[in-house]
Swiss-Prot record:
Protein EC: 5.3.1.24
UniProt entry tagged with the keyword Isomerase: yes
Xref: CDD domains: PRAI
Family matches, as InterPro entries: Aldolase_TIM, PRAI_dom, RibuloseP-bd_barrel, TrpF_fam
Protein family according to the UniProt entry: Belongs to the TrpF family.
Reactions it catalyzes: N-(5-phospho-beta-D-ribosyl)anthranilate = 1-(2-carboxyphenylamino)-1-deoxy-D-ribulose 5-phosphate
Gene that encodes the chain: trpF
Protein's name according to its UniProt entry: N-(5'-phosphoribosyl)anthranilate isomerase
């Protein structure tokens, strides 16, 4: 199972989190986010990481030109779209970045809203399901209603996100079967400042399921 820790702001924490077992790290490229990092900060963090760690830039309603430039300049291996991007935008981004993983985040309010996932699976590599919040795009600490995801089986891999912590991860994974999990606020002391004890506890809990 892939484990993505999102909202990394400190290079030394990124190295420690990767060594604890994370398979992917997320860097927020949304300027008004408290977890925002610059291209040079991302590049510095990526340079220190093992080659097998996926490095994902998180964008919201950015242009294809802007996304492409940041990916090239920073060395990111993936792009996560966390705004209101439509399937056609994902298709165009795929043409611009054919060798980069594209993840589309969907903020789920209801079972009906879950149906929009099928519109994206032709154009992206991976989906990410997050909890809906009217004002924040992610890192809200709100959990999804896992029950509505029990039958979710898209034609591509998917991450479960939304308020996951070491304390609820086992319960979440007893109800749903994602390809990976994504955590941000659930392993933090403050926005962007990861708590390595919480990260370690997360991997202990995940290991206990095996």
């Amino acid at each position: 199972m892939r484990v993505k820790i999102c909202g990394i702001t400190q290079p030394q924490q990124s190295i420690a989190i990767a060594s604890l077992g994370a398979t992917a790290l997320g860097f927020i490229c949304v300027p008004n986010s408290p977890r925002y990092v610059t291209t040079s900060q991302i590049r510095a963090a990526v340079a220190e990481l093992p080659a097998d760690i996926d490095t994902i830039g998180v964008f919201a309603n950015s242009s294809i030109v802007e996304i492409s430039q940041i990916v090239v300049d920073s060395g990111l291996t993936g792009v996560q779209l966390h705004g209101d991007e439509l399937p056609d935008f994902c298709y165009q981004l795929r043409q611009a970045l054919p060798n980069v993983e594209i993840i589309k985040a969907l903020r789920i309010r209801s079972l009906e809203h879950l149906g929009t996932a099928a519109d994206y699976t032709k154009y992206v590599d991976t989906l990410l399901l997050d909890a809906y919040h009217p004002e924040q795009l992610g890192g809200t600490g709100k959990t999804l209603d896992w029950k509505i995801l029990e039958q979710f089986n898209p034609n591509c891999p998917w991450f479960l996100a939304g308020g996951l912590t070491a304390d609820n991860i086992v319960e979440a994974l007893s109800q749903v079967s994602p390809s990976g999990v994504d955590l941000s606020s659930g392993v933090e002391r403050a926005p962007g400042d990861k708590d390595l004890d919480k990260v370690s506890k997360l991997f202990e809990k995940l290991g206990s399921r095996e």
